[in-house]
């Protein structure tokens, strides 16, 4: 059975499983991960740290005039969104994720979860999503699997709500248990290779009402999407990727040279090297689409900040952080 995505209608779906009671049970955690493709934890992130992060979102969108200064609800003022930075580039430029993950309570939680020091991958999405202006479309934004676009980077996706997000506000929905099958993306539809409508069974979708302090941790192959905001306020969330430091982590750093055939990088942690590019490399542009091999030197330049994953000297993924 596949979902019929009617305009403006959020399909009925079950609640996410809550994993708080197995947080310190490694065997149970791994079993839930294998079964579901995610963990959902209620109220585990320090709410004061979350509030400090949220205040940076509120200050930014208040400066744009789309909410009233000091409005804790972030109610939309009605101002034109024609120049609104939907990818929140000002926040991305400030890298506000760094002080957040460095907060002692946040660091402790992820160290506890991973049983290792966290290695943060700076693929961060800052979401300050206004109420939908066009309500004639289905509410699912773009169903996708992160792993399709990031081969060779076995990260965990961390989705963090910064305010209460109910069904009207939208938020995250995910497809439970579909992380074990093949990629659902349509290889005949470059450059984004979208997942076809109806590829995810209706009974797989899960969501809940999210609150500050909650976090969803997803397998990189779990299909998921944002949901259009039908409330009167902005939807505030941040998602970021993490790995255990002892894992096969990518190089995060800057390009030192690049041609159509190879790229050299210098990593922030001291790792460096020259790696081969070929047709199988997923070189990702800012829009998420695959950059053709012959266009890579025109889209990436020495000095650019990148994330690079490799296998046996060959680049599997080359992408900007944001």
Predicted features along the sequence, with ranges:
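Short, flexible, surface-exposed loop segments at domain boundaries
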Residues: 248-274, 286-322
């Amino acid at each position: 059975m596949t979902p019929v995505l009617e305009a403006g209608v959020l399909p009925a779906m079950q609640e996410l499983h809550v994993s708080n009671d197995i947080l310190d049970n490694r065997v149970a955690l791994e079993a839930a991960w294998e079964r579901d493709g995610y963990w959902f934890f209620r109220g585990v992130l320090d709410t004061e740290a979350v509030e400090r992060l949220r205040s940076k979102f509120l200050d930014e969108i208040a400066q744009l005039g789309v909410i009233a200064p000091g409005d804790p609800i972030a109610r939309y003022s009605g101002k034109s969104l024609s120049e609104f930075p939907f990818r929140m580039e000002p926040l991305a430029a400030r890298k506000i994720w760094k002080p957040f993950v460095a907060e002692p309570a946040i660091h402790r939680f992820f160290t506890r979860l991973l049983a290792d020091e966290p290695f943060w991958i700076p693929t961060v999405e800052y979401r300050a999503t206004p109420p939908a202006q066009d309500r004639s479309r289905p509410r699912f934004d773009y169903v996708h699997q992160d792993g399709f676009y990031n081969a060779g980077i076995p990260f965990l996706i961390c989705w963090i709500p910064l305010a209460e997000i109910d069904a009207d506000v939208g938020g995250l929905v995910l497809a439970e248990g579909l992380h074990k099958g093949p990629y659902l993306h349509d290889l005949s539809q470059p450059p984004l290779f979208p997942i076809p409508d109806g590829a995810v069974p209706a009974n797989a979708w899960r969501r809940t009402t999210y609150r500050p302090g909650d976090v969803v941790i997803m397998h990189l192959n779990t299909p998921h999407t944002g949901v259009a905001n039908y409330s009167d306020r902005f939807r505030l969330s941040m998602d970021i990727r993490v790995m255990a430091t002892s894992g096969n982590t990518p190089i995060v750093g800057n390009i030192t040279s690049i041609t159509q055939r190879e790229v050299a990088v210098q990593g922030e942690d001291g790792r460096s090297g020259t790696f081969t590019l070929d047709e199988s490399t997923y070189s990702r542009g800012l829009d998420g689409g695959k950059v053709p091999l012959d266009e890579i030197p025109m889209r990436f330049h020495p000095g650019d900040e990148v994330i690079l994953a490799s296998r046996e000297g060959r680049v599997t993924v080359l992408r900007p952080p944001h």
